[in-house]
């Protein structure tokens, strides 16, 4: 169980480093964000099953709901930006130009 927790922690930190390093494209940022959410889901599920917290069994499901909402909003933003500008650079997301 310890090796699975360490692997998921390593996956989270790798996705976080990817988010910090490859932040020029929106698609790569969304993929790193999904990797972070997936590792958080697996870690929370393992923690709940290992510690047998019966009160918090709904926490991983709520995390999946928020991840699905984040993915839908991110994909809608990606489609809008790529249709408007033709590129998926994050520099195009300047809110002052509205």
From Swiss-Prot:
It is found in: Mitochondrion inner membrane. The keyword Transmembrane helix applies. Its EC number is 7.1.1.2. It catalyses: a ubiquinone + NADH + 5 H(+)(in) = a ubiquinol + NAD(+) + 4 H(+)(out). Keywords: Electron transport, Membrane, Mitochondrion, Mitochondrion inner membrane, NAD, Respiratory chain, Translocase, Transmembrane, Transmembrane helix, Transport, Ubiquinone. The chain crosses the membrane at residues 29-49, 61-81. One of its GO terms (molecular function) is NADH dehydrogenase (ubiquinone) activity. It is an enzyme of class 7 (translocase). One of its GO terms (cellular component) is mitochondrial inner membrane. GO terms for biological process: ATP synthesis coupled electron transport. It comes from the Eukaryota. InterPro entries: NADH_UbQ_OxRdtase_chain4L/K, NUOK/Mnh_C1-like. It is a multi-pass membrane protein. The keyword Acyltransferase does not apply. It holds the Pfam family Oxidored_q2. Core subunit of respiratory chain NADH dehydrogenase (Complex I) which is composed of 45 different subunits. Belongs to the complex I subunit 4L family. Core subunit of the mitochondrial membrane respiratory chain NADH dehydrogenase (Complex I) which catalyzes electron transfer from NADH through the respiratory chain, using ubiquinone as an electron acceptor. Part of the enzyme membrane arm which is embedded in the lipid bilayer and involved in proton translocation. This is NADH-ubiquinone oxidoreductase chain 4L. It comes from Cheirogaleus medius.
């Amino acid at each position: 169980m310890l090796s699975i927790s360490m692997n998921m922690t390593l996956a989270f930190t790798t996705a976080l480093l990817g988010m910090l390093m490859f932040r020029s494209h929106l698609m790569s940022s969304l993929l790193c964000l999904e990797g972070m959410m997936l590792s958080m889901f697996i870690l929370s599920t393992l923690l709940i099953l290992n510690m047998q917290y019966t009160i918090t069994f709904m926490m991983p499901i709520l995390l999946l709901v928020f991840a699905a909402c984040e993915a839908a909003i991110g994909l809608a933003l990606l489609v809008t930006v790529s249709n408007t500008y033709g590129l998926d650079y994050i520099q195009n997301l300047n809110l002052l130009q509205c």
